[in-house]
Amino acid sequence: MSEDLFVSINFPNGKSVKQPIGLYINGEWHKSAETWETVDPSIEEVIAKVYLAGEKEIDYAVKSAKEAFKTWKKVPGSEKGELLMKLAELTEKHADTLAAIEAMDSGKPLVSNARGDVDGTIALLRYCAGWADKIYGQVIPTGPEKLAYAKRTPIGVCGQIVPWNYPLNMAGWKIAPALAAGNCIIIKSAETTPLSLLYFATLVEEAGFPKGVVNIISGLGTVAGSYMAKHPGIDKIAFTGSTKVGVIVQQLAASNLKAVTLECGGKSPFLVFEDADLDQAVKWAALGIMYNSGQICTSNSRIYVQDSVYDKFIELFKKHVIQDYIVGMPFDDNTVVGPVVNKTQYNRIKNYIEQGKKEGAKLVLGDEPLPLKQGYFISPTIFADCSENMTIVKEEIFGPVVAISKFKTEDEAIEKANNTTYGLAAMCFTKDLERAHRVSDELEAGMVFINSTENSDIQAPFGGIKMSGIGNELGSNGIEMYTQIKAVHINFNNKL
């Protein structure tokens, strides 16, 4: 193992790590002709340079995965489950290191955010390990002269593209079900946040996965991501990211009609009815837009409050955000809101804030100067009295910025909630059980949260409709997305 494929990284908490920077292909670490600087968004300094995969490296990864698939697909589900369980144990053993890498590379607060992401990855690995020997088909009754059955088989070589907002967690959502179902994978991190997934590759190796089954690469979306999406040797592509890029991925994937799973953008509405528990609505609403600095696809970035409790909600919401959502450095134990991921996102979010003010939204909180002299920090920002034609209401901002509006009737709330091209998630706060079911039926979203938000479960499907995506991750549905149906017909006595 070449030492120049690893670098030493020192964390602000005094600890350090031997960080891989190469391409993990066919069970070995490789260099390439191109490198990329990954930057700590809290201090705007380079952490490390990682090697980038180009077409040549991806071709090699596909070749390796195809060869490995010949034997991996035949490995009993129980053995696949054991390997995934071993990987979960190793991830748990290295959880503090992985969380520190995420905090430095993405700006996530270590205590309030990054460690929880790693714990979620561990839980999902164990969940999918349990599924590996329980992927059943069905026997179909056809009469005494024939037997027909359908079996779920692995798809083959799966390309997976991970976003920068949850580098390891979203990787786990793709890696675990794909392997449990018997596929081989080539997974690409976001170029902005490659480090935790590269470190995870060392755990894959230690767990004992056969060469070629798991290939982990860094690469530019415009180069490696595009090439993976259109590669004729890749049988499925799974992508999490913006809707704009998701559309491109689907177009490229059509070149060989590969299976596609897309988890894209959102502009989730959060409805607060007058009978709601306002204290709870305030706390959940804040969590749903300020956590992870608002960089969550399901963020409830639109809040609609019934007119009779509108002013009270805004008063409580502002007070709660000021008290509980402290902006600070990722390794500070008190920090809840860290920096956004890079300068591009920082400028983009700032432009949206200016647009909100320009279009007449009332700035209730935010846009104040922060004591931090460097880093891509944005203070929690609350706009009120927003109208449906405002840019901050229509477009995904992907930052700690929320637009609040009022409604009079249930029908008006539903109409406003559905007035978007997105359909990932929606939230409804009410004590009226009948209303909860009635409204959830009418909301155009792949997921509806009643009296909560951002508390999806690994056992339940996660996915959107409309321009928010295709297919699901998590739950049994997430496993099935990595399988295909094969129907087998057995003739007993039917002779010609």
Curated annotation (Swiss-Prot):
Query: What's in the keyword line of the UniProt record?
Result: Cytoplasm, NAD, Nucleus, Oxidoreductase
Cellular component GO terms held in the UniProt record: cytosol; nucleus
- Report residues binding NAD(+): 241-246
* Location of this chain's protein in the cell: Cytoplasm; Nucleus
Name the enzyme's class. oxidoreductase
GO biological process terms, semicolon-separated: aldehyde metabolic process; beta-alanine biosynthetic process; polyamine catabolic process
Per the record, the similarity remark reads:
Belongs to the aldehyde dehydrogenase family.
The record places the active site at 263, 297
Organism in which the protein naturally occurs: Schizosaccharomyces pombe (strain 972 / ATCC 24843) (Fission yeast)
Name of the protein this chain belongs to: Putative aldehyde dehydrogenase-like protein C922.07c
Q: Can you provide one Gene Ontology molecular function annotated for this UniProt record? A: aldehyde dehydrogenase (NAD+) activity
The EC number of this protein is 1.2.1.-
Kindly list the residues the record flags as site (Transition state stabilizer): 165
